[in-house]
Amino acid sequence: MNNPVCLDDWLIGFKSLCCTLAVIALLII
């Protein structure tokens, strides 16, 4: 049994990480 809340938190964290990396990449460029 998977916990939907934990899954949602993981997805939100993953998206936040991707957004952060994208911003850093734009700043470097």
From Swiss-Prot:
Note, other: Encoded in the Qin prophage.
Induction (record text): Expressed in both exponential and stationary phase; expression is considerably higher during stationary phase (at protein level).
Keywords: Cell inner membrane, Cell membrane, Membrane, Transmembrane, Transmembrane helix
Ion transport found in the keyword field: no
Entry membrane topology: Single-pass membrane protein
GO annotations of cellular component type: plasma membrane
Bilayer-crossing regions: 10-28
Name of the molecule in the record: Protein YnfS
Pfam families assigned: YnfS
Location of this chain's protein in the cell: Cell inner membrane
Origin organism lineage: Bacteria, Pseudomonadati, Pseudomonadota, Gammaproteobacteria, Enterobacterales
